[in-house]
A protein has these predicted regions:
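Conserved MFS/SLC helix-loop-helix module at the cytosolic interface between two early adjacent transmembrane helices
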Residues: 19-58
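Structural signature of the two symmetry-related core transmembrane helices
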Residues: 35-49, 235-250
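Central cavity-lining transmembrane alpha-helices of secondary-active solute carriers
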Residues: 11-25, 211-223
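Helix-breaking motifs and short loop linkers at transmembrane-helix boundaries and internal kinks
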Residues: 32, 53-58, 232, 254-255, ...
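Glycine-rich segments within core transmembrane alpha-helices of 12-TM secondary carriers
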Residues: 92-111, 298-308
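Cytoplasmic helix-loop-helix junction between adjacent transmembrane helices
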Residues: 63-100
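Extracytoplasmic gate region of multi-pass secondary transporters
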Residues: 167-211, 218-221
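Helix-loop-helix hairpin linking two adjacent transmembrane segments in secondary transporters
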Residues: 97-146
Length: 352
């Protein structure tokens, strides 16, 4: 499989966020949040079993599609379900700890694959392991008593969901999600190339930039989850977004491996909790419409497919990864510009 096909398959996952987010919101209103999450787990588990039963290109594509569907449904339904389990004061911290678990899974994936490489099934043994973990999570949730609030009985539609953008805070946070996901994907593309360009590292070693980045995000999500249980989300957002911007500027001027990895790690720490904060504040602002808010914000995740091609054009035009970093820094200024709005947002539309 050539690089173009591989890239298209990877980017296709963002298509599911665009297509299925709002229909998942509709499903939540019909069968409830908990059942929607259980369905997402079931689809994910089936997707993990397909490569075990038959491993060829066509079946892997089917598995990848099912994985994208399950992931989209989970992303839309899980955070609103959390609002039925924890208080508003602990919502941001709880969502952030969830991001920590997600980051840990991403970080451990390659390590587990390497561990299983010497087994009978080889690295593909990771699929039944992931399927088993998913089934356990599904069973645990299925038997857990959760009292869901019937806060919105009217039917969710595409028009009703997009009408939330009439609220200035929701539209600002929606754009914030676009920026966060776009920059995250852009970073993943840019870091290895930056290390190749400035440190003359071979491609296989240049991937350490992403490893450092994901490790920093994992640590940052854990620390953020603990801190956000006790301290103001708006102050944490201010510090994190400014730290990330300083890190991007530092990367632009860094020329040696140590400094590049330092600023990559610093950016990961700054980035780690911003998605959770925006998501939490959006749901707290419209607590009667959390299903629609969640669906709309997850539509914004599809924006991750927009920025990387633009970075490619800019890099080809100027012939340096520094131009991509400058572009990312300029885009990131939006997150800093959100600071006063994050400070002023009030639940239930009572903003200043």
């Amino acid at each position: 499989m050539d690089a173009k096909v591989s890239g298209l398959i990877s980017l296709s996952c963002f298509l599911w966020f665009l297509i299925l987010s709002i229909p998942t919101g509709m499903l939540m209103n019909r069968i409830g949040r908990k059942k929607t999450v259980v369905v997402s787990f079931a689809i994910t588990a089936l997707a993990m079993l397909i490569p075990v039963l038959k491993y060829d290109f066509a079946f892997v594509l089917v598995a990848f599609a099912m994985l994208g569907i399950g992931n989209t449904m989970l992303q839309v339904a899980l955070n609103p379900l959390v609002t039925n389990v924890v208080s508003a004061e602990k919502l941001t911290g709880t969502i952030t700890l969830g991001q920590f678990i997600k980051a840990m899974s991403s970080f451990l994936g390659p390590i587990l694959a390497a561990m299983f490489a010497g087994s009978v099934w080889g690295w593909k043994a990771i699929f039944p392991v992931y399927a088993a973990v998913t089934v356990l999570a599904m069973a645990w949730l299925a038997v857990s008593p959760i009292q869901e609030q019937l806060i919105e009985k009217s039917e969710i539609t595409f028009a009703r969901t997009f009408s939330l953008l009439r609220d200035k805070y929701i539209v600002l946070f929606f754009i914030g999600i676009l920026v966060l996901v776009g920059v995250d994907v852009g970073m993943g593309v840019t870091f290895p190339k930056l290390l190749q360009e400035r440190c003359s590292l071979p491609l296989e070693k240049a991937g350490m930039g992403n490893s450092v980045y994901f490790l920093a995000r994992t640590v940052g999500a854990f620390l953020g989850g603990v801190v956000l249980m006790r301290f103001s989300a708006s102050k944490f957002f201010t510090a994190s977004s400014c730290l990330a911007l300083v890190s991007l500027v530092g990367l632009i001027f860094s020329r040696n491996l140590t400094m590049i990895l330092f600023f990559v790690a610093l950016f990961g720490l700054g980035y780690a909790n911003l998605f959770s904060i925006i998501f939490s504040l959006s749901m707290q602002k419209m607590p009667q419409k959390t299903n629609e808010v969640s669906a709309l914000l997850i539509v914004g995740v599809s924006g991750g497919a927009v920025l990387p091609p633009l970075l490619g054009v800019i890099t080809d035009t100027f012939g340096t990864q520094g131009s991509a970093l400058i572009t990312l820094a300029i885009v990131w200024v939006y997150m800093v510009a959100l600071i006063p709005f994050v400070r002023n947002v009030r639940p239930s539309g009572n903003e200043n």
